[in-house]
Amino acid sequence: MDITEPAQRLIAEKLTDMLDDAGYLREEIETLAQSLGATNDEIEAVIARLQQMEPVGVFARSLTECLRLQLADMNRLDPVMETFLDNIEMMASGDLQGLRKKCSADAEDFAQMIADIRRCNPKPGMGFG
């Protein structure tokens, strides 16, 4: 990790200890800031740095954020994919036609979007012992 400032490094170490098994940070920023004696902005800045680490998606705070990080890394995060992610609950409920319409995507593009999402790892932290 390329965090050399001592206060940020301490925050990074504490945040690493707070990861769940899937690699997510589940606590709210305000709670993290209060428990670490830092400001919300300081916590956000360190999280942004940590999210640049491998595996991509670790330190996300939700499945959607995890997918966004991975899709951005694959250079597949465009406005249409953002719309898909903003409405991903439609995929979970099986409303693929409604989701495709919301994304204004043709069948081929929509199938590619689903394939890209399936290539993502929803639990990037599971590879750690």
Model-derived features: positions:
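Alpha-helical scaffold/interaction cores of sigma-54-like transcription cofactors
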Residues: M1-G129
